[in-house]
């Protein structure tokens, strides 16, 4: 998440940047995978966090990338965007399987970089360059929480995979966009290690100052008071920061669910052919055609 000209950031390649909000200082804001390849978005209920993710999906859907959804609220947030998703999982068990596949893909892509003697996806020749993958996690706490001892092994696999991806996957074009209400040590082992790798930060209205500190104190401590004072009657307002220490107050434009669904359908042809994601490809509901004029002509009444 970075501001455009006027906020001190350098230009990014257009193919990897998309409009995601409005900067309070310049009126322009763009998020970019190459500038902030791993990101964390925090916010309380009704803070605008879901609207922010909608805008991310709307922008990313128009780019040549694979979109992967992890929505453990049974898909209520992301299932509608299935026409543009290469993969969607809605339970922690399936999330563990999907993340394991992504780690295996990461290792395979590193082998590809090694064979070509380069260190970054974008240094590869275009004809062999893999498609970037963006993983959108709707509520990260659901991946950390366990209800019984038998869930501990699954949690360990999920957390280990997320940390490995966050630490290394930028170079091979796998990116994480993680959302949650809180994200700190109270989630358990591995949470703070993962958070440290998610260098792009966006914090909406939160329920306590500690949550704002979780999201901003390690990258832009001066932004914590601004995030703590976002009022309830300003949903969509947030503070965006990055490791440079710079930050800006932003406002996510209101975007309807139907608008994002329409964009996902329009750009469904951009879904790349990635066999490793095929087992997780969501079922796309048929589009219901709009009702047309009635073909039944009324008959005149006669006595």
From Swiss-Prot:
A Pfam family matched in the record: FtsK_SpoIIIE
GO molecular function, one term: DNA binding
InterPro entries the UniProt entry points to: FtsK/SpoIIIE/SftA, FtsK_dom, P-loop_NTPase
Annotated S-S bridges: none
Domain FtsK: start-end pairs: 26-213
Superkingdom of origin: Bacteria
Binding site for ATP: 43-50
Keyword terms of this UniProt record: ATP-binding, Nucleotide-binding, Plasmid
Keyword flag Nucleotide-binding: yes
Record's keyword annotation contains Hydrolase: no
Protein purpose: Involved in sporulation inhibition and pock formation.
Protein name: Sporulation regulatory protein
